[in-house]
UniProtKB/Swiss-Prot annotation:
Protein name per the record: Testis expressed 46
Subcellular compartments: Membrane
Species the sequence originates in: Mus musculus
Phenotype seen when the gene is deleted: Male mice are sterile. Spermatozoa show motility defects, lack the typical hooked sperm head appearance and fail to penetrate through the egg zona pellucida.
Topology class, membrane: Single-pass membrane protein
Keyword Transmembrane: yes
Membrane-spanning intervals of the chain: 26-46
Family matches, as Pfam families: DUF5531 (PF17671)
GO CC annotation terms, alphabetical: membrane
Chief location category: membrane
Length: 165
């Protein structure tokens, strides 16, 4: 999925660059991987903050009623009151279940976004590491070749000419 997303972003790069200032800004974000990573991390933090604010700012009216009522007294003679209280309690439980379900869904979305950010981060670092490792191994390989060449020449310059064969 991430590979398809990267392919899509690469194919849209030219189109975005020619579509105006917003497209040019998006093309610039795509071309610089660390800035893209920082942008995704900022989106992750923003979405986390929005989930917390959504929960704090929007208390539902049944929940407020449940907070203001005191503990009910048990009267076996008053069955109608007990049924109403049971309905209120069931409504509160249903509300709690809905809130918990929304929070868990939001948490799952945040985890998925976080995983995508880390996948991109690992791909960026893997490319950097592989290029460093490739350059380092080339340098090491060159020095070995030179060492072997010099050792071969030094063997050929010894007194016995049979070592060169």
């Amino acid at each position: 999925m991430l590979g398809e997303l990267i392919f899509l972003l690469r194919s849209l790069h030219g189109f975005l660059a020619s579509s105006g200032p917003i497209g040019a800004a998006l093309a610039w974000l795509i071309s610089f991987k660390p800035i893209l990573f920082a942008f995704l991390l900022l989106l992750l933090l923003l979405s986390n903050w929005l989930v917390k604010q959504e929960h704090n700012l929007a208390p539902s009216p049944p929940q407020e009623e449940a907070e203001t009522t005191t503990a009910p007294e048990v009267h076996p003679k008053n069955n109608v009151k007990n049924k109403e209280e049971l309905e209120k309690i069931n409504a509160c439980f249903a509300l709690q279940d809905k809130v918990l379900e929304r929070l868990m869904f939001s948490e799952m979305k945040l985890k998925a976004l976080e995983n995508q950010v880390f996948v991109i981060w690992n791909k960026i670092n893997r490319r950097r590491w592989s290029s460093r490792q490739r350059n380092f191994s080339r340098r090491r390989h060159r020095s070995r070749r030179h060492d072997s060449t010099f050792s071969t020449l030094s063997k050929c310059t010894t007194v016995t000419p049979t070592e060169c064969d």
